[in-house]
């Protein structure tokens, strides 16, 4: 039959860590098939299932002869060390990939729960979600400097920053307020080593 309206080309956009080749191999676009017969929903499902790094994907028909794959990748906000590798965790608390090398600028999660009511009540996953919530609330400048997010209990979360600075954050509540207060404290006392925003209405700063 006519080559008109048959799939002849595939275009992929939005990939950052994944490669176009990886995405297109999993998508398995049926080149040569009639464009109208391509099951775009099945392709989207397959991509999300096989490539958990993909957060959203739109498969679109690009008339007269193309299929477009528009990918949005998950972004790591925290890393969990596991057997010498690093598990990437996104802003929704989804563990989506394991990598050998820690990506730059993503803090490491240290879960050191005291065998407390907090752990029994919230469990490791609940504590991970709190850490993710805190990481997501950090002001951009602080997030870049954050090396470790340490969770001892639900309301004992702290950050270790570059230059050995420590931030006592407290619980994940009032994150936006704490972020604003922390940014102001750091501006006012750039040489301080310890910042406490666990009670954001009464923050504290000390030299070391």
UniProtKB/Swiss-Prot annotation:
InterPro entries attached to this UniProt entry: Cell_div_FtsQ/DivIB_C, FtsQ_DivIB, POTRA, POTRA_FtsQ_type
GO biological-process terms attached to the record: cell division
Keyword line: Cell cycle, Cell division, Cell membrane, Membrane, Transmembrane, Transmembrane helix
Primary location: membrane
Matching PROSITE patterns: POTRA (PS51779)
Membrane topology: Single-pass type II membrane protein
Domain POTRA: 5-74
Keyword Nucleotide-binding listed: no
Family recorded in the similarity comment: Belongs to the FtsQ/DivIB family. FtsQ subfamily.
Protein purpose: Essential cell division protein.
Stated name of the protein: Cell division protein FtsQ
Biological source species: Streptomyces griseus
